[in-house]
């Protein structure tokens, strides 16, 4: 992962619960609607194989990482499959240490000021504030007061409508997941709806620059 490139379009799509035969059409709809960065969560059945297939299908058009990484086992399986960055819902010390030692971008989750600070000084590329929707954009403004140098990734509850507010309040980047990659759309292979939802985020970001 090139972090500087990620910051040019600072949006991360979270894919959870997808099936192997959906990977290729998902990659195509993601690429065609302008999203550049995705994660596939490790608590999805067959996650390493899904990551490997996504990397192959993307042919360099996407930056692909692994999410919900909670152990060294998860981490190594993800990296072997081709993941280039790591995301966790919490700070996992041995995962952090491995990523830092091997210069792998890592986004640990945190919520309270103490957790956010600890994750940052532990070497986080960005700190994933999760679940962001519990406090909203104003929380980011308050956190950035004393911690103005900490880079924050807003996760959970970010919509096309409030995305720019999160960024204005201090989020360096945002995520979206179940609201775009909806279970019913995935089940029915309604990839057009997914593409339209992605496009709303990308277009709103471009308009707000």
Question: What residue spans do the PLM features occupy?
Answer:
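Conserved N-terminal beta1-alpha1 strand-loop-helix module at the mouth
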Residues: 1-81, 101, 160-161, 188-208
